[in-house]
């Protein structure tokens, strides 16, 4: 499928209709879904109706936005009015939200065509999309491997050309890690830049919604459509949203790029990053080594803070108001216990237990409070780094995509796949992953580019210059 601008040009020139584009995406989904399993719900009727509305506007001579008629996938933890939103959990089986999330509302107003709700790790808890209660998504580059997580469905759908762009959410790497594993572009914006209203909460101080695409330009276009203040979200920032595409320039002259020394290794992923640094330097960037001493402590701090917030956020699912409820419970307490025991998967239960333990009276200071102090130190490390450089880079992940089932019995090994991405969430910074090479098995590596608060412009500029100087993003999986 073509880029957003290419499809927009075809629409305004009446070379293709929005309905034809939507039908092509839906046909691709129908063909690939038996093996890929990216989507939990395909919204064919809605997609055709939205596409017809775009065609009617074009026929009437109205101007349309860049996103009008563009097929998009929506992660299934974003509320969509009248369309099931399950968070890939049995406990929300059959739940149909009575309201629309801010981001999906903004995309609908822009004329985007939603083709379906994408698979994820249950309640966005996981790094492989194997924790879904309904199906396991495959990696388009190798169907025996995971697409990453928790937004694996969105990443796989974009990589497989089932949609042009998609939305995901990122709490500790859930956009960037699957973007790296699937060889696409994924951006976690600054915390508060994109409204979380209608995003089913996992860890509220870390969650952020962002775009997946196959190019940096498409990422910039989608970010511009979903960013901006929202009075319905108390953490939403009151900032002007620029046209992010204006920052996409091929030269990096004057840009200072910091390499996080704690992420430099001789591993294949480290070597892919070193090759990328040579490209950045050739584009005019000044490369510096920058130490973030507490970088590695982001992982253990995160696995106290995020489960603690999750234990509170997930307490609302009790079988009373919506979703799954056990039959013939003897008492109210019995109904609560059995509903949650049957409705939640094993990883969600593990996080709830960790969080409840960390918040308990005897351990609060030793765990939760200490983790928050570590989070502050990590943020201070980044502040010191950005006093010297414009952007920071690291590998997105320590390895390429692993085999399905390889890490499910070893949670710690699974958690380590987010080692590079988690600190960015802890500090509330923007971070982007884009393809920077392939391993011997033909699996993609990701380069992570991190910016200072609200400096998405510099992140996108650096990513675009690198992308245009290389051809990694042009490779496609053979499906």
UniProtKB/Swiss-Prot annotation:
One Pfam family hit: Amidase
Keyword Nucleotide-binding: yes
Keywords assigned by UniProt, alphabetized: ATP-binding, Ligase, Nucleotide-binding, Protein biosynthesis
HAMAP family: GatA (MF_00120)
InterPro entries named among the record's database cross-references: Amidase (IPR000120), Amidase_CS (IPR020556), Amidase_dom (IPR023631), AS_sf (IPR036928), GatA (IPR004412)
GO biological process: translation
Designated name of the protein: Glutamyl-tRNA(Gln) amidotransferase subunit A
Catalytic-site annotation from UniProt: 75, 150, 174
Catalytic activity: L-glutamyl-tRNA(Gln) + L-glutamine + ATP + H2O = L-glutaminyl-tRNA(Gln) + L-glutamate + ADP + phosphate + H(+)
Functional summary from the UniProt entry: Allows the formation of correctly charged Gln-tRNA(Gln) through the transamidation of misacylated Glu-tRNA(Gln) in organisms which lack glutaminyl-tRNA synthetase. The reaction takes place in the presence of glutamine and ATP through an activated gamma-phospho-Glu-tRNA(Gln).
